[in-house]
Amino acid sequence: MAELRGILLLLLYMSHSSSAICGIQKANIVDQLHENLVSSTEFPWVVSIQDKQYTHLAFGCILSEFWILSTASALQNRKEVIAVVGIANMDPRNADHKEYSINAIIPHENFNNNSMRNNIALLRTDSAIHFDDLVQPICFLGKSLHKPTALKNCWVAGWNPTSATGNHMTMSILRRISVNDIEVCPLHRQQKTECASHTNKDSNVCLGEPGNPMMCQVKKLDLWILRGLLAYGSDLCPGLLLYTSVDDYSNWIIAKTRKAGPPLSSIHPWEKLVLELPFHQSNIALTKNSYSVHSYAWPQSYSQGLRMSTMYDKQKDVWQNLRVNGQQEAGRPSNVAIQPMYYDYYGGEAGEGRAVAGQNRLHWSQERILMSFVLVFLGSGV
């Protein structure tokens, strides 16, 4: 009965939110490939941030249809950048990789170019990112958890420098290395950074480029979270790694996206509920990386450039395998030329004026679903 109650609580919460499923990938990470190569459906949230000449600047991770997280250091004084998605295999013979223009770059207001403190930035795409097997968002944790979340299966992904290119990244097949957090770190650590080390001592793959994402799974769940962005990687392979802790910046991410729109939220509202459920090996993967289309009055110049798609979670075989899958429709690319908005470190967004309007009210169909679950609760006596 408690198990049924837990499932219904999760479905109730999901039914009233326009939430997008995040942290789900089609590939099974335990399928080891040669030379730590990433398969085409692994890490579908990793993107390449490039300039207009298609020079790779840094990696980023998709958080939602419109938001990508990356490093501030790689985006200084950049006016025109794009995000190339579905990059697990960047075979030059395959020229059909989708790219999205960035119309807002939001570096952390306290980013220090000398110490590299607060080296984090948000990027907003000009049009909604289309999700499929090769392109998906990843979750991020909230900092306000009462206890650390149990994680497993942590990896750093990136492109390996070759002898032919020196320190420059060659866009090819994405690689990955397994890492673990270490508490006693001999490296000098900035605030809001953590230390990790390679788990495979025989690895000769070096992926220590700043900005490379570190990703882990929440234990007992098939749910991937963005743990951090590399701040420092040793030249020795294997070696030590420093990474910027994303959950330490969750409040910043939420505040900035709420101000610029559409807003994001971390998955910590799910944590206490999900981890207390009596499922020992459950596969429930639920998240709240969401935004409400109805809670923002968009400026005309921006709304013309966006075709906001209605998101609705697609539940598939919930009662059989306890997994919730999501699907989102893509927004059409903008036909209106929109100049990117840029944020200075201290002044915020130029031309601010977004007003919050209306109530975050349930759609009629969602209200009916919510009422149905309430009736199930009452009828079952749980």
Swiss-Prot record:
Domain of life the protein comes from: Eukaryota
Compartments, record wording: Secreted
Molecular-function GO terms, alphabetical: serine-type endopeptidase activity
Example of a GO cellular component annotation carried by this entry: extracellular region
Glycosylation sites: 113
GO BP terms, alphabetized: proteolysis
Signal peptide: 1-20
Location of the Peptidase S1 domain: 29-258
PROSITE patterns: TRYPSIN_DOM (PS50240)
Disulfide cysteine pairs (residue numbers): 154-216, 185-195, 206-237
Keyword terms of this UniProt record: Disulfide bond, Glycoprotein, Secreted, Serine protease homolog, Signal
Family, as annotated: Belongs to the peptidase S1 family. Plasma kallikrein subfamily.
Entry protein name: Inactive serine protease 54
Lineage: Eukaryota, Metazoa, Chordata, Craniata, Vertebrata
Gene designation: Prss54
